[in-house]
Amino acid sequence: MPKLEMMLLVLLILPLSYFDSAGGQAVKVDGHGDGMDRYLQRDDREARITCQPRGRSKWGRCCLTQMCGNFCCPRYGCRCVYRSGRGHGCSC
């Protein structure tokens, strides 16, 4: 099988939950809540995080900045505000 076909096959097989178009980090919760802690301990990161579980799934989405609705704000210091007619948005 040529390399291009193999790459396409791999991309089709990978679950889409690994990719987050809103910029969040997909994290598997292990039931004790320390999965994200271990992620942040790498490279001595000091970050405040916000996480949002997804129903009964073990997967959730976490932001290293402020979470606003279903996406992450672009940088630290932003606030999540609700704008009537447009929904949630970041105010930086």
From Swiss-Prot:
Signal sequence annotation: 1-24
Subcellular location, principal: secreted
Keywords in alphabetical order: Acetylcholine receptor inhibiting toxin, Disulfide bond, Ion channel impairing toxin, Neurotoxin, Postsynaptic neurotoxin, Secreted, Signal, Toxin
PTM annotation: The homodimer contains 10 disulfide bonds.
Gene Ontology MF terms: acetylcholine receptor inhibitor activity; ion channel regulator activity; toxin activity
Tissue: Expressed by the venom duct.
Keyword Signal appears in the UniProt entry: yes
Cystine residue pairs: 63-72, 68-80, 73-90, 78-92
Pro-piece positions: 25-45
Gene Ontology CC annotations of this record: extracellular region; host cell postsynaptic membrane
Subcellular location: Secreted
Keyword rRNA processing: no
Family membership: Belongs to the conotoxin D superfamily.
Function: Alpha-conotoxins act on postsynaptic membranes, they bind to the nicotinic acetylcholine receptors (nAChR) and thus inhibit them. Through its two C-terminal domains, this homodimeric protein would bind to two nAChR allosteric sites, located outside the nAChR C-loop of the principal binding face and at the adjacent binding interface in a clockwise direction.
Subunit relationships: Homodimer; disulfide-linked.
Free-text note on domains in this protein's UniProt record: The cysteine framework is XX (C-CC-C-CC-C-C-C-C).
Name under which the protein is recorded: Alpha-conotoxin FrXXA
Organism, scientific name: Conus fergusoni (Ferguson's cone)
Organism classification: Eukaryota, Metazoa, Spiralia, Lophotrochozoa, Mollusca
